[in-house]
């Protein structure tokens, strides 16, 4: 893969003004015949300076439609990928793959009990939770009437507390099926309805990990649901209101999260508190900026926290091929880091600085996914 940094960066502030250059890891997805993800390490504060392009650390050969998340455990700092498409091929059979950010080792983990395309992934301590993004089952419509349908384990957990890495493989652990999210997905329908309707009409649309609770809202029915990771029980914490953000809300500080607002489509902060697993309190805190080009804060779904006292970073990507049809060979990736003022409880988060970088990706051999950025993490 060839890659280079744009030589004319747009830069509002000089990099390195008291902010440490925290490492950011960016995953780029590759094409149809040889599915893989490239792991790059980039400096969010580089601002397009010469000699500081994204550095390729590893290429993870695994299935398409994988989800990734950062995990800190006794083993160190990992980026863990789970799930994938149901297509069987000799490329990327593993459904759990791990990248060690310190040793750059690629580790193979145990397969979940079911294949989950783009699953919802959340970490609570040293446990990784994987939930199907929408309910799914094995079998055909005709099988729904003779008992031959197998309900997949929609919700599973992988506990890393006793795991060991031996010869590039994760041992001493395995995925365990958890109680099906009955309040989340409509469990009361018959088998035929699960095939013909539920799989397309119900999907996880918002989620977050708050303390020992996993919060979920789904399309198709109102409300917010909580899974207690200690008791392994589901409860309804709000019967009428969904979580106010789209997809994942990421931790930004004590009880503080960043998410894409459902109402404004802007990156917004939220103070989220779960009270005894039975009620939910959410306070919205706007993210405001006086810098030109505020719309860039409004339009991206890939973003990460750099810490409550540093700010956050957004990443957008778009393909630049001459043809609209695949295969896709070229893409641009824009990374913008936002420095923020010290946060004061009850006030807005104010953006005061900004650094921009542009990467150009060209891969004529493996081709590129569209969009090509599969995730960005700081760990």
Predicted feature locations:
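Recurrent small/Gly-Pro-centered beta-turn motifs in extracellular repeat architectures
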Residues: 28-30, 82-85, 132-134, 218, ...
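C-terminal closing repeat unit and adjoining cap/tail of repeat-based domains
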Residues: 4-7, 274-379
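Long, repeat-rich segments with strong aromatic
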Residues: 221, 232-303
